[in-house]
Amino acid sequence: MKIIINKANESLKIDINRKLILPYAVGGLMYSPAIRTDIADMVITKKYKYLHSLAICLEDSIPDCSVEAAEKQLAETFRKLEKAAEYANIQDLPMLFVRVRSAEQLIRVYDSIKGSKLLTGFILPKFDTSNACEYINALKQLNTASRTVY
């Protein structure tokens, strides 16, 4: 990750280890229901100029009867974003997080987006002692098999 600081027409570029800065870098987080078909276009066209972090929600913004459709739309959103990043040289994409309902869904979603490099991490709702082990084990499984996902 590079940070560019502009001061009095001078630029200072600093390389920063993403893992060190990530806990402090999320900033304002925009939520969007995963069922929306315009998320990729919104990101690609930079509809929100200063969008830095985006949570694509599969949890309480999605009715139970629409979860499967929302998961399919999420996979399509990531497919479009991957294609744009590869072919249109789209840069400066926001950090992308997916808010899941369960540890099982976390793994299913990760597989459906084929471990997209555009995914920054997951938001684990209602995380507590009753589900902590399941979420942690799911993340360990992903992180063992691929790159680090937060």
Give short role names for the model-derived ranges.
Residues 1-150:
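Expand to "…catalyze enediolate/carbanion chemistry for C-C bond making/breaking, isomerization
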